[in-house]
Amino acid sequence: MGKKRTKGKTVPIDDSSETLEPMCRHIRKGLEQGNLKKALVNVEWNICQDCKTDNKVKDKAEEETEEKPSVWLCLKCGHQGCGRNSQEQHALKHYLTPRSEPHCLVLSLDNWSVWCYICDNEVQYCSSNQLGQVVDYVRKQASITTPKPAEKDNGNIELENKKLEKESKNEQEREKKENMAKENPPMNSPSQITVKGLSNLGNTCFFNAVMQNLSQTPVLRELLKEVKMSGTIVKIEPPDLALTEPLEINLEPPGPLTLAMSQFLNEMQETKKGIVTPKELFSQVCKKAVRFKGYQQQDSQELLRYLLDGMRAEEHQRVSKGILKAFGNSTEKLDEELKNKVKDYEKKKSIPSFVDRIFGGELTSTIMCDQCRTVSLVHESFLDLSLPVLDDQSGKKSVNDKNLKKTMEDEDQDSEEEKDNDSYIKERSDIPSGTSKHLQKKAKKQAKKQAKNQRRQQKIQGKVLHLNDICTIDHPEDNEYEAEMSLQGEVNIKSNHISQEGVMHKEYCVNQKDLNGQEKMIESVTDNQKPTEEVDMKNINMDNDLEVLTSSPTECTRNLNGAYLTEASNGEVDISNGFKNLNLNAALHPDEINIEILNDSHTPGTKVYEVVNEDPETAFCTLANREVFNTDECSIQHCLYQFTRNEKLRDANKLLCEVCTRRQCNGPKANMKGERKHVYTNAKKQMLISLAPPVLTLHLKRFQQAGFNLRKVNKHIKFPEILDLAPFCTLKCKNVAEENTRVLYSLYGVVEHSGTMRSGHYTAYAKARTANSHLSNLVLHGDIPQDFEMESKGQWFHISDTHVQAVPTTKVLNSQAYLLFYERIL
């Protein structure tokens, strides 16, 4: 009989745990029970030994009023030292002291968790019997040797009496304040607004810095109270015009992430706790994004995006469930007809989430062909703006557009300049280390050619947009000229007189390519960014300035007022036959044309179109002058200027213009074989803000890639306390009064990153202030005031996890900002 094997004994796994932590290999070397038991005899618990010997321990009266740093016990020798969140970091210094054997295992005397400095990770002591016995022994010794309340000396009794006197005085002062508050209307003063520290849950400074700024966003707290109300009834307009009554839905309670966020904001407003532990909120974030689990270095901007996107997804899910319940179907299996109905109601987007109502804005990308001056607009929503930060080296690499020529030398130069962008494609691991230099160079050149061809194909495909991939909105409006199209395709034009501003609409729909003269063709195209982007193609021509807005591309490809569309062999849909009978009165000037094609009353399900003209020169106009910020390269205004600068599309970036392609096919130089050749033209492109968000979040892209390496740009970027966004907004920016030429924002939060990419620390600057009533009315009720409200005064605080300190405004403006939080001044 052989002996039984004991090495292969497995440990039962607890299925209830979400993640299985790896076993630490340093438990045997980091534990010494004999030395630990000797050191714990007659010891003062929860006091740093080094701070005590350095005479840095304060009096007991001061000690009880202030928060103590966390104390960690070395499981090798019993040394007690303050944690890494304190100023001295004696526990970490004790580990770094060179010894023959490592003192790497420490035990927290606050929450009884074990940490290994070598692994830089938490150790589950339940996975090791020896470690579990040591932790249990230390906990028993700590509970036995701590003094009981009855065993107090006279000094402690005197301190308690002083405390009672102070508490009685505080109660009297509170009663006076309550009486004053009853007599006078309640006003939120900055002194009453509290700023509290957040416990570090293990390299979670990136999370704490963002949450400090969100806790100082009063609009978010007010809107979350409205979201949490049970039994909320919301009305959604029907997608079909035949259905006149809106759909009433009853929303369920919000999701777990939203509830955890609301609970966290309420805890931050309580006056009892000095330090808040956001464990529940962080665990909900980790459930949405597993990448934040563990104790690795993370990015605060990514955390903010995952947090906001997660709450927005929960709100959309609430609406979808409410629509299903309204149709009387609560089962998981749905038929196709009901699925299509739910999708149609969801596309209405009449219920924006609270995230979009606070942080949501809109960008408009304007592209104009230099030959036919056709303008197309693409609208994209955003929650924050990521701005480029140019260092001294990248600022010198400027390319002159006039000197660009189609030569092999320029192509090689372009490939060298684009090396940084292709660094993820050309990884070191792709080339074997054992090959010769000649083969390595050959492989690099081949990778460059493939990457360049791939980029060209993506750019060419990116200029065409698939009609069925765009989410659109019905937009019926009263216009100057109405044209009713019957089933035979006849058009009758009626003229009225309205100002030109009445025809420009602020809701955008569509994905219709350019309408030129009597015939037009809609190309099926691909949008590489978002399938739900709303695209507004404003087709402005010098001959017949027309703009087409489609309300439902999927339906218009099937039936356009009785004119069925033909589908080409390559999948493209031609609707030129549907517009052959569309004739305009020659007596009318192009600047006075505005046609609305209404659906026939006898044909249910047909869609609404409108054709509106606009001056192409105003497409690139802004609310205010922007050239002033081109000189100051070290300011946030210059970063916004670079983000919204006017670009020229040349050479490989040329625009595929449908109008010019159509003209060439119909012109004298048309191909005799009937083949249709695409025409690529030079164009101008600019991206501007078309919807100013109530809370503006700016992200400075300091972490950049240089070749195969990653680096951080430590350049100081100046940012003002009052920011005017008007130079970067479109001329017809929404949420801005007509006569206002300023879009002002006030700074209230900064996230700063100090250190390097490998080892850094996030801190926050937050401004405790009174709530902006005009901003609350805009978010809650949609009211846009005519006059500006004065900037709310307050006190700035610097928060580093649990450490909170009041600072002047100059220190805030001199910080190395990574995230900036601005609120709208209305």
Curated annotation (Swiss-Prot):
General function of this protein: Specifically deubiquitinates 'Lys-120' of histone H2A (H2AK119Ub), a specific tag for epigenetic transcriptional repression, thereby acting as a coactivator. Deubiquitination of histone H2A is a prerequisite for subsequent phosphorylation at 'Ser-11' of histone H3 (H3S10ph), and is required for chromosome segregation when cells enter into mitosis. In resting B- and T-lymphocytes, phosphorylation by AURKB leads to enhance its activity, thereby maintaining transcription in resting lymphocytes. Regulates Hox gene expression via histone H2A deubiquitination. Prefers nucleosomal substrates.
Name of this protein: Ubiquitin carboxyl-terminal hydrolase 16
EC id: 3.4.19.12
Superkingdom, natural source: Eukaryota
Phosphothreonine sites (modified residues): T557
Pfam families on file: UCH, zf-UBP
Catalysed reactions listed for this entry: Thiol-dependent hydrolysis of ester, thioester, amide, peptide and isopeptide bonds formed by the C-terminal Gly of ubiquitin (a 76-residue protein attached to proteins as an intracellular targeting signal)
Covalent cross-link (Glycyl lysine isopeptide (Lys-Gly) (interchain with G-Cter in SUMO2)), residues: K140
Family in the record: Belongs to the peptidase C19 family. USP16 subfamily.
Record-linked HAMAP family: UBP16
Domain comment, as recorded: The UBP-type zinc finger binds 3 zinc ions that form a pair of cross-braced ring fingers encapsulated within a third zinc finger in the primary structure. It recognizes the C-terminal tail of free ubiquitin.
Domain named USP: residues: 196-825
Phosphoserine PTM positions: S189, S415, S552
Keyword Transcription appears in the UniProt entry: yes
Binding residues annotated for Zn(2+) 1, in chain numbering: C24, H26, C116, C119
Record carries keyword Cytoplasm: no
PTMs per UniProt: Phosphorylated at the onset of mitosis and dephosphorylated during the metaphase/anaphase transition. Phosphorylation by AURKB enhances the deubiquitinase activity.
Subunit structure: Homotetramer. Associates with late pre-40S ribosomes. Interacts with CEP78; promoting deubiquitination of tektins.
Record field: compositional bias (Basic and acidic residues): 149-181, 394-408, 421-430
Chain segments carrying region Disordered: 146-190, 394-460
Disulfide bonds: none
